[in-house]
Amino acid sequence: MSRVIVKGLPIYLKEDRLRDLIEKRLTQKHQSTDVQSYLSDVKLMKNRDGESRRFAFIGFRDEEDAFDCVNYFNGTFVDTSKIEVSMAKSFADPRVPQPMREKRREALKRLREREELLLADKKDSQKKQKSDSNNDGGKKHDIDAEIAKNKQLQEFINTMKPSSQVTSWETVQSSKTQGEDEEAADDEVGEMSSNPLLSQALALKGNSRDADEDTDMFKLPGNESDDEYVSLNGGSNNANTDEPEPQMMSLDTFDTAGPTSTDDMAKDEAVSDLDWLKNRRVRIKDGADTPVSKQQQQPDTEQQQPEETEVETSQESEEEKSLKKIRETGRLFLRNILYTATEDDFRKLFSPYGELEEVHIAVDTRTGQSKGFAYVLFKNADNAATAFVELDKQIFQGRLLHILPADAKKSHKLDEFDLKNLPLKKQRELKRKANSAQQTFSWNSLYMNQDAVLSSVADKLGMKKSELIDAENSSSAVKQALAEASVIGDVRKFFETRGVDLTKFAQLKNSERDDRVILVKNFPYGTTREEIAELFLPFGKLQRLLLPPSGTIAILQFRDVPAARAAFSKISYKRFKDGIIYLEKGPSDCFTRDAQGDELVESETDIQKATAKEAKISGADLLEAQSLPAADKDDHDDDDDDDDVQAGPTVSIFIKNLNFSTTSQQLTEKFKPFNGFVVAQVKTKPDPKQPGKTLSMGFGFAEFKTKEQANAVISAMEGTILDGHKLQLKLSHRQGTSTTNASSKKKKKNQGKIIVKNLPFEATRKDVFELFSSFGQLKSVRVPKKFDKSARGFAFVEFLLPKEAENAMDQLQGVHLLGRRLVMEFVEQDPEDVEQQIEKMTRKVKKQVNTTKIANMRNSGKRKIDLDEDDENDGLQG
C-alpha cells in the first residue's frame, strides 16, 4: 500500500501547499532536489460547491515513503489543525464504508427486482384465468340446457333478481297475457339481462357451431319458436307481417356509429333492458374470429418471454460481463497509471498470475511521454481473469489501478491457408520475419558480414579485395579470420569509447534485452550513418546512433519502446541494397552514459551535416582519433588534461566505509568534479525481506581514465566525510567495467593452453597454426582426429607465455573460420599436488571400468547393473 489519507486539514488549505509539505519531507529523506518522481498523486477532496472536505489522498511511488509519511505527519499540526494520517484503503477492502450513491443504487435494484417479481406473478395469474375461462367455455351448452329444462330454476332465478333489474308489475301482467311461449321468451331475456354469466353464455353460444354455418342471427334452443325469435329482433308479434325483419347491426356499422347512441339509450329510462341488449349485441362468426384472437394472444405471450430473458440478461452484473470478455480476449486495459511507470513495473505486477505475452504502454509520439494507460496481454485468458479480480481497484504506485477488459489485439498474420498458396521460399521468408521478435541469434552479438569485413580491411590498407584474398592460396580462410579479428578489435574500441558496456553482450539473455536498443547487422560496406537513420527515423525519434568507422555494424537506441518494436518488426530481414538486414535486440543497461555530441540524432538534417563532416578518413586519422577519444567527450578547459587521456582500461578506486543510505547518485556527485571521472557506483545486493529492492553493501567503486588522475583523487578525498561516514580509498586491482570479460575468472588459472571448439572439419593443423601464430609464439598445436583421419571438431593450442594466450583470446573472440564461429576456453590446469593427480587418474580409470562393464552386460543380455560409484579410495586398495 503506497497511498495515505490525511484527515482534519484546514478548510482553506490548497493542494499546492499540501504538496509542498510532502515534498519537503521527501527532500529531507532522499537528500535530493528532484523529488517529484517519488510523489505520484496529491488529491484534495471537494464537494459540489468546490469547498474542501478537509481530507486528502497522497500517493507515493514506493511503500517505504508512504509509511514514512504516516510516521512523520500523523498527529502533527497544520497551522492550528491537528491532522490524522493513515494508510488508505482500496475499494476492494471490505472495511471501506459504502457510499450513499451505492446504497441508493442497491435500493433501486432491489425495488426493481420486487416489481419484476410482481409483474411475473400478475402475468401468471392472467394466464391461469385465461386457461380457466377456456375451460368454462365447454360448459355453456350444459348451463343453457339445464335452465331450459327446469322451469323451477327459471322461476328461482327471476325471483332472486335484484330490485333494480325487476320490471314493473304492469309489464309483468301484460307479459302474462301473451301466452306461455311469449312468457318463456320474456323470462329467458330477463334472466339473461339479470345474470351476467348467463348473458355471456348466450352471447358466446354460437361459437360451438360448425364453421360452415354463416348466419347473422342467434339460434335459440329447440323448444322456442320462430315467433319468439322475431320478437327478440324487435319486430311485430304477428308472424304473418310482410314488413322486412330488422337485421342485427354489423360490426362495421357499429364501429362507424360509435357507442354514443347506445350510451344515450342506457341513460333513457323509457328504454327497456331488452331493447338495450339488442343494440349491444355483436355477431361473432363461428370458428373464425375467436380462434384467430386466441392465436394472436398466444404469440403475444410467446413474444413476451424473450423480453423477460432480455431483462434478466441486462441485469447481469458489470463484473460478470467484464470477466466474460476477458476470458475471450485475455487482454487487460489499465488506466490511471503513473506517467513515469515502465513496462517492467507492470511485468513484475502481473507476472505472478501467469505468463505474459505483451505489455504495452501508450506513448505520445510528439513528446515521448506516457498517455496514462497501458495494455497487458496474457498467454492464458484464465490468468488474465484472475489478475483482473485480484488487482482491479487496488493501489499501485500510489494510484488506484482501474482495470477494464480490452478488445482483442488486431493481428495481420497470415494463416496456413494463405501461406500454402505461396511459394515455399516466400513462406519461409514470411515465417522468419513474423518470428523475428522472438528469435535469438546463434552467432555472437558483434556478428559482421564477411564481405563487409574484407571490404573494410582492404579499404583501410589501400588495396583491392582480390589482392587481399587469393583464391588459389590455401591460407585465404586464415587471412579472412585475421581480418575479421582486426575489425572486431576496432569496433570494440569504438564502442567502449562511446559508453557501451561490452560485458553485457557476453552475458546476454532473453530476459535482459532492451526493446529500445537494436543492433543492425549484415549491411554492406560503405553504408553511411545518414542511410541507416533514414531507414529507422520514420518509426520514431532516435536517441542514439553509433556507427564505427569500419562501417560493418551499428547500434541505435529509440526514445520510445513502441516505435522501436514497430521498427524491429518492419525492418527485420528487409532487403537493403544488395543484402538483407539482420536485427537483434541489445542488452539492457548496455550504455554507461547518456548520448553526447555526434551520437545524438535530432532530425534528418542533422544526420546530413554529420555525415558531410565524415567524408573520407585515412587509416592514420582513424588510429589518431582512436588513440585520443576523450578530446571529444570532455569539455575541460585545461588542454594538458586532454592530452593525458588514454583509451582502453580504466582505473578503479575502491571506496569503503560508506553509509548504507548513500546512493550511487550521491557518490557520483561527490567524485564528478574531478578530471577524468568516468562512473561511480555503490555495490548493492537483493533485499531478502522486500523482493525487487536492493540493499547497500557499504562499499563502492569510482573509475577514472588514468592512474595519475585516480591517485590524485585518492590523495584529495582520503578521510573526507560523506553522510556522516569517513571515506577510505585505495586503488582497486581489477580493470574497469569497460574491459572486463566474462572469462576473467578463467584467466587467473591460465597456463597458456587454449581449447578451440566448433572448429570446421575441413580445417587442418596448418590453418590453426597460422591463425594463432600471429598473436605469439606457439608451444604446440594439436588437432585430434577420428579413426578415419577426419577432424573431431576441436583443437588444443598452447602458447609459450600465458600473456600471449590471453591476447589471442581477446582478439579472436567471435572470429569465424570457414563460416564457423570459434569458441575458445582455457584448458583446466593440471593439479600440482600428487594426491590430486592420483585422484584424477582414479576417476578416469573408474569411468573406463564402468564403461567396460556396461558394454559386457549389454552384450551378454543382462539388464541388472550397479552404477553406484564406490569410495574414492577403492582404486588404491589392493
Curated annotation (Swiss-Prot):
**Region listing for Disordered, in residue ranges:** 118-143, 159-269, 287-323, 732-751, 852-878
Q: Do you know which SUPFAM superfamilies this protein is assigned to?
A: RNA-binding domain, RBD
Where is it localised?
A: Nucleus
Q: Name one GO molecular function term.
A: mRNA binding
Q: Which residue ranges have biased composition labelled Acidic residues?
A: 180-190, 305-319, 867-878
Where composition is biased (Low complexity), the residues are 295-304
**Which example biological process does GO assign this protein?**
rRNA processing
- Give the protein family: Belongs to the RRM MRD1 family.
Name the record gives this protein:
Multiple RNA-binding domain-containing protein 1
Origin species: Kluyveromyces lactis (strain ATCC 8585 / CBS 2359 / DSM 70799 / NBRC 1267 / NRRL Y-1140 / WM37)
